[in-house]
Amino acid sequence: MKITAALLISGAMMLSLCACGGTAEPNPVQPTETPAPITYTKEDGRLKMEETYNSNGLLFSTIIYEYDEKGQLVKQAEFGISDAPTGYKSFEYDAKGQKILMTSFVADTAKDYSEEYRTNYEYDGNGNLTRATSTRDGKIVSVTAYEYKDGLLSNEKNYEGESFVASEYKYEYDAGGKKTRCVRIDNIEGDTSENRYTYTSDGLLLADLSYDADGKVISRTEYSYDDNGNAMKLSVYNAKGALISSTSNEYTYDEYGNIKRCAVTHSDGSKGTTTQYRWEYAKG
């Protein structure tokens, strides 16, 4: 049974879990509103095309993915309204299959492109990413340096330019390799914060506690799941333990166990967005 395509009828995704980290690549400007329906097309198990439509059902943007004979992504071409090219990203790999270069181009005309920035990647002998350096016009824009302990990411430093450490993340793990602590140092704002994580017996995130620089609890976020491991409810509490907000997901599944629908409800009783999925299956 091979999934060849999936269609998201509405754009908001399910409960997102806490992410603690940064990126070395410049962040592109995001639109204030994201068009809702997205169609994904897969071929031979690989994502080939992603089409985004606006609320009126008109094609808003398209991303086409190209791969080499090894199955490595080598190009990500982006198009806007009326299939007008907006830019593309190219990727290069070393003999080990490790991505060593990503170059981003922006479309000047329908046929002409200019380089926007590039990111070089470096690895240690174990294949762990140790450094990502982004440059624009030959000048270093940002660097992210990674350190590992026992094969797990232990430290991440995000530089603005070559030398100024804008932020730093320190990670700790339990015996099973689950992240239990993340300390974030913000050298721009002069602030330090911390997150501590606990998990269910199945390894799913159960609670995320946020602390300030003095070690006082700022907030607590709790998660619950259904039997399939999908997030069912997210509850946020303040420092005094009072419920601030909660969001619940309700799922329905098709005969193959894939999600058909996810309906979101907020703690005030208001309905959030509903995401519907249509899966196409290859015969045989």
Give, region by region, the residue ranges found by the protein language model.
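Bacterial signal peptide processing site
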Residues: 21-24
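C-terminal motif of bacterial Sec signal peptides marking the signal peptidase cleavage site
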Residues: 16-19
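Positively charged n-region of N-terminal signal peptides that target proteins for export
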Residues: 1-11
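Buried hydrophobic residues that stabilize the cores of well-folded domains
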Residues: 26-284
